[in-house]
């Protein structure tokens, strides 16, 4: 069972309330989006156990970025939270042992701007990595090797300051988990391999933290995982067996909330999001203005 919450800092709320009172209002109008577990092959038996207050709306389990949504007029600061439970299942895959079908599907192979962009540099890199290879499994493996063996984990500024996170990663050879995942997705799509985004939390008894990873599709097996930042970590540790494990597989300690990058919320957030690409900790809008950074406090723990 996970417990998660989001709220304004007291200082942020005080400033917002003072501005509202200067306009003749005694409350601030707040909209909140908090991530919830979404339906996917690795996640089932999802139960929303409790909320700090009944949400105005709960997005369906199939939403690309699933959230609980609250809308309220606040005279006092408060937090918006949820407790939920789910079953996490790891489906083992051995892509390097499979025989790929001669004809592969073409869904999830298009550009998805601004970050899944087929720039000249990315197209040239994909061509170089897959030159002489016809097997889609080996193409995906070459791309995974490039990311995990060449890109160094590096904390990133908020993604909204980047024009294109994937081209920048391929050139600088630096990125965090989301940048690595998006770079893998972009190169796979250029090579004709269906690939997509998945993200949420790493949820362990002792800790919980944000994480992003990728999925790729090879017929007849179907969707498999590529956790490039975990693979890069194993490469740094000299653990080749585990680096290869994350080409096709995930651990069971994941809470999946998002199945697409840069997807709108349901209902949509009309102001600028703190993270327009992803949603791992939630978003708050106060009187039509989105909050970010130190204006917001979040929690996530295993209970």
Q: What residues fall within each predicted segment?
A:
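Intrinsically disordered, low-complexity N-terminal segments that are enriched in acidic
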Residues: 1-90
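Terminal peptide-recognition signature
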Residues: 32, 143, 214
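A short, polar/proline- and glycine-enriched secondary-structure boundary/capping micro-motif
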Residues: 44-45, 92-93, 235-240
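Short intrinsically disordered coil segments
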Residues: 47-52, 96-105, 228-231
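Acidic low-complexity segments
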Residues: 59-69, 73-171
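Active-site nucleophilic cysteine motif
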Residues: 136-143, 173-188
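Hydrophobic/aromatic-rich core segments of domains that either
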Residues: 179-269
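Low-complexity, Gly/Ser/Thr/Pro-rich intrinsically disordered linker/tail segments
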Residues: 248-303
